[in-house]
Design a protein with these regions (language model features):
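Residue position within the beta-strands of beta-propeller blades
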Residues: 1, 60, 99-100, 160-161
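Short, conserved, GDST-rich strand-edge loop motifs in beta-rich repeat architectures
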Residues: 1-21, 100-119, 170
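Beta-propeller blade signature
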Residues: 17-31, 117-130
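Beta-rich, blade/repeat-based domains predominating
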Residues: 20-25, 35-57, 65-66, 81-96, ...
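Short loop/turn segments that connect beta-strands within beta-propeller blades
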Residues: 29-33, 72-76, 128-132, 174-175
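Loop/turn-rich, solvent-exposed surfaces of beta-rich toroidal or solenoidal domains
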Residues: 52, 84-142
Length: 177
């Protein structure tokens, strides 16, 4: 994904928390080694993306847009929207999309700038691949791990990576904090 132009300032980023204007889009690498901007995916800080190869669909998380959108790559139309604060990364596994969301404000994140381990709440949300409707939500208070950035389900566990700590964590898919 192309989140924003290289000359995008911190002031513009903070303004976009409220304005939610288009800052970037998903980019496709073609067979001719060229990049094609998918303008129909334009949104506020497109971040995590995942390709559902079986259905030829693309999921794009809009970090400051507070939503994830499922696009049909053939028709270039939206098939579903999941609205939730600050989606980060997305994984497709087991016939579902797994979207990690930051369940805290940008102001709370800014207070973590100097700390090694920033403990703020987040969730990993299991979504339908047909329309991004919520199937199940796993919520974490992040007491000792750091802010979750990605959740990968595997063998009854949810493996969680963090963007503001030096840890990964394993959570039981049958329990939530």
């Amino acid at each position: 994904s192309h989140m924003f132009d290289s000359d995008f300032s911190m002031i513009s980023a903070l303004w976009n928390v409220f304005a939610k204007s288009d800052t970037g889009m998903a980019v496709k690498w073609t067979q001719y080694n060229k990049f094609e901007e998918l303008m129909y995916t334009a949104g506020s800080f497109p971040n995590g993306i995942a390709l559902d190869q079986k259905n030829n669909n693309l999921i794009v998380n809009y970090n400051l847009g507070d939503k994830s959108i499922l696009f049909d790559l053939n028709s270039k139309q939206s098939l579903g929207i999941y609205e939730h604060n600050s989606p980060d990364n997305v994984v497709i596994k087991g016939g579902f999309a797994w979207v990690t969301n930051h369940d805290h404000s940008v102001a709370e994140s800014l207070r973590c700038a100097e700390t090694v381990n920033c403990t703020l709440p987040f969730s990993v949300n299991k979504l339908s691949l047909s329309d991004l409707s919520l199937v199940e939500s796993y919520k974490f208070k992040s007491k000792n791990m750091g802010i979750g950035t990605v959740g990968l389900p595997h063998d009854g566990s949810l493996w969680i990576g963090s963007y503001h700590s030096d840890r990964i964590a394993e959570g039981n898919l049958f329990l939530s904090e």
